[in-house]
Amino acid sequence: MREIISLNEGWTLRFPKGERAAETVTLPHTWNAVDGMDGNGSYLRTTGVYSRTFKKPVQPLTGGRVYVEVLAAALDATVKVNGTVATTHEGGFSIFRADITDLCRDGDNELTIEVSNEDTPSMYPASADFTFYGGLYRGVNLISVPNAHFDLDYYGGPGIMVTPKPTADGG
């Protein structure tokens, strides 16, 4: 049975370059809530590190997989579990997931998501007439599923897709 656990509460956000003091935040969150709205274009473009602990979900059936689901992280993200990189993602507007089963341990686990809204040559657009908000501006979930489950690895999709293939006779 699929279980979705919200991880939106209890995050610590720190800035490795020291631009701001560490703070406790609830998702969704952006560090540009104020400076991104002042109209002068000089908002903070940096890397923020979100971290929190979680307990590995127990699947009622034997086996099972655990995924972390990030609903949006602007603009580059690196997800780590217990210090090991689980996945990276470029592009701040889409859902992404990572199977973290083998990185989890019984008891407390540390989830860290490094997010950057810095100007990156590999990311389009590099500049625009809007603010490139930095942060986890949608939620983060754990998804626990049994071994037999719909695909959760395909581009953050819902796990099932139907594609009609019309034929010449209209069928």
PLM feature spans:
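Residue-level marker of intrinsically disordered, low-complexity segments enriched
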Residues: R2-E3, E23, N32, V68
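Accessory beta-strand-rich segments of carbohydrate-active enzymes
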Residues: E3-I5, T12-K17, N40-G41, R45-G159
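Extracellular glycan-recognition surfaces and repeat-rich motifs
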Residues: W11, G18-N32
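N-terminal glycine-rich cofactor-binding segment
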Residues: N32-N40
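Contiguous beta-strand segments within globular domains
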Residues: P164-G171
